[in-house]
């Protein structure tokens, strides 16, 4: 396992799902994790990981609010003196066919999935620049590349994440900061658990490795890009989809 010993990592949307998996893997790798979420369940997740030996603490943060993000960042800097890694994992879906989609459904997804990257990254980057080191890794998606019915809003944000990644890496590389993204494919989740078995089988049939992914799979994908060993990799979207859509 790559080591993150002594590093401070922010993981947004860490209360459950892929974010929870990233928190667990990063703690196993030795990082101290700030779990950000608007859900109070984040505290329970942090307590569980901490009880298993992880160095993790919960901050209730609204990533769309510059004030909320700024206060959380300053609290981390005051206590730990630095931020090495920012994982922009938090995201939402509001699926509906395009002609029936409301402006609220469109704007809410854009705000959380894309605009929040501006807020969090701009708050953290000055500290990374000062330290001469940093890793920013954001959540894209296979559907940002292949699209999906009823997800015009979501797909637009995830394609935007990859564009944001390619652009920002050109600005901050000279500061020792790399910027990358991870695009998960079909991942086991509370949503997939509620799907009919035939739908899951049809999805797995499209995945060459023969199974759906797990939060742990995603955690290791993020761990690689967050490691010092990945220091020459920047501006990419890592497609973690079992070969469902090779890039």
Where are these regions (language model features)?
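Alpha-helical segment proximal to the catalytic Tyr-Lys
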Residues: 126, 170-171, 231
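Substrate-binding pocket helix/loop in short-chain dehydrogenase/reductase
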Residues: 97-98, 105-110, 192, 203
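Active-site helix of classical SDR
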Residues: 121, 157, 165
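Residue(s) in the substrate-gating loop at a strand-loop-helix junction
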Residues: 141
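Short C-terminal tail/terminal secondary-structure segment
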Residues: 3, 146-149, 223, 234-247
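Canonical Rossmann dinucleotide-binding motif of NAD(H)/NADP(H)-dependent dehydrogenases/reductases
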Residues: 2-34
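C-terminal helical subdomain
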Residues: 174, 181, 204-229, 233, ...
């Amino acid at each position: 396992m790559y080591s993150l010993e002594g590093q401070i990592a922010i993981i947004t949307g860490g209360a459950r799902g892929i974010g929870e998996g990233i928190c667990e893997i990063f703690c196993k790798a030795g990082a101290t994790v700030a779990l950000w979420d608007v859900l109070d369940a984040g505290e329970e997740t942090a307590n569980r990981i901490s009880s298993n030996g992880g160095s993790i603490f919960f901050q209730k943060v609204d990533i769309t609010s510059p004030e909320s993000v700024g206060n959380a960042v300053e609290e981390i800097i005051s206590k730990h003196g630095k931020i090495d890694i920012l994982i922009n994992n938090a995201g939402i879906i509001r699926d509906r066919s395009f002609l029936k989609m409301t402006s609220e459904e469109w704007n809410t997804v854009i705000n959380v999935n894309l605009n929040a990257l501006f807020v969090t990254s701009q708050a953290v980057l000055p500290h990374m620049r000062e330290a001469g080191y940093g890793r920013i890794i954001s959540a894209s998606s296979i559907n940002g590349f292949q699209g999906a019915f009823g997800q015009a809003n979501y797909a637009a944000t995830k394609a935007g994440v990859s564009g944001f990644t390619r652009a920002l890496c050109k600005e901050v590389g000279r500061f020792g900061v790399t910027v990358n993204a991870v695009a998960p494919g079909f991942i086991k989740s509370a949503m997939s658990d509620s799907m009919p078995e035939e739908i899951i089988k049809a999805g797995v049939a499209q995945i060459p490795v023969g199974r759906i992914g797990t939060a742990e799979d995603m955690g290791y994908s993020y761990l690689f890009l967050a490691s010092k060993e990945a220091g020459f990799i920047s501006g990419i979207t890592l497609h973690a989809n079992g070969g469902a859509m090779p890039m």
